Amino acid sequence: MRTSPAYPDRRTAFWVPVAIAALLLGGCDRDRPTDIAAEIARIRAIDNHAHPVRVVGPGEQDREFDALPVDNMEPASDPVYLRPGAPGTLEARRTLFGQLGKPRVTQQKGDGYPAWVLDQMGVDVMLANRVQMGRGIEPPRFRWVPYVDALLFPLNNSKLAARNSDRRAFFADEETLLRRYLKDAGLAASPASLDDYLTGVVTPTLERQKQGGAVAEKFEAAYLRPLDFDKVDRSAAARVYSQFRAKGAPPDDQYKILQDYLFRYIAGECGRLGMAVHIHTMAGAGSYFDVEGANPLRLESVLNDPGLRKTKFVMLHGGWPFIGEITALLEKPNAWLDFSAQSLMLPPATLAHNLRQWLEWVPEKVLFGTDAYPYSDEMGWEESGWLAARRGREALALALTAMMRDGEISHDRALELARMVLHENARKLYGL
């Protein structure tokens, strides 16, 4: 992992004397956590999920880092690691920017600043979950993951938006994004029929994004509704669309029929186009978030749909707190997960426990991720990404060390697993 010249890699400084002590004590092959930590620190990672901010000029602002920014919601009890003055935040800033400070470094690096941040994180490629790519957020270091939730809600959303203040803000954002997609399709409003909506808006939007470099499409639907997307006949969905397209808000049960059909249609199109499907599966931000609605088990019927077996589903954030449930889903041939966000919000020892379960079950389906995000002025995407990368590596070292200590794997296998999680699994999944 590359670091600022003025601030050496502190993990290396810590682990080297521990390694010497372990060797002097004559530890056996399975009791060498120091070797694993040092190797992990050197592996250039693929970050499966993050929200980098583009380079902006004087007076400019970037709000396309998220389709549903979570910085304007009602107050909630934030996790300890996201609070002002959280452990590690000051260290991250000092390590990244030293005495020069963030504004000066940002100015010096110019358009190369985002790629420089990746170097400090030890990341080779970052999957950028953004509405649109932008200045400095470009291939090959950054790969695009746009949003498709807006396509699920082409009707009157006033009833859904009236649930609470978070939903009101979120549906306003989704409707703005849908208008953008309609404009890109040469339309001012949704077409008259579902068939026309699919062929004139949904599929062309996905194809344009694929041509624009997208490697996956992102659903953050758990912020808007539960994740149980049932299998629906096209005719039933078409009736709902036609009945309510120009009328008031549809009843919830009727609108769900259309949303469910659209989700599976989009997922199928992603499979056809060679794009993965990313889905938020974790307790999310805000005081109104439906935690149970984000249980990854709600996705089982989607994963079991024979028509969607060519689509690769990546369950983001590792399903926390439903760790056992998401572990079982890894047996599905079209299911993967990453541990983004957990790598930032959980202590390494806690995350290590989750990682060990996945590594003992289906290790080739586990992906490294940070969820780097501009949470605040104090913790931007740079600081959160650096912290999550470090904690994620520490957790991986702890998990692999415990597995070696218990005789489950050899030292060589531990190194192989580390390379898989940090790089190889994602490389194979996306063909990078």
For each predicted feature, which ranges?
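Bacterial N-terminal signal peptides that target proteins for export
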Residues: 2-16
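C-terminal motif of bacterial Sec signal peptides marking the signal peptidase cleavage site
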Residues: 25-27
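Mid-to-C-terminal alpha-helical segments outside catalytic/metal-binding sites
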Residues: 32-48, 60-62, 66-109, 363-365, ...
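Alpha-helical scaffold segments that flank or form the walls of functional sites
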Residues: 41, 60-146, 151-155, 164-189, ...
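Hydrophobic faces of well-ordered beta-strands that scaffold small-molecule active sites
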Residues: 46-50, 125-128, 143-148, 217-219, ...
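A solvent-exposed, charged loop/short amphipathic helix patch at secondary-structure junctions
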Residues: 167-187, 232-253, 393-401
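Histidine/acidic residue-rich metal-binding segments in metalloenzymes
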Residues: 194-219, 226-335, 349-367
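H/E-rich (His + Asp/Glu) clusters that bind or coordinate divalent metals
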Residues: 294-298, 303-314, 318-432
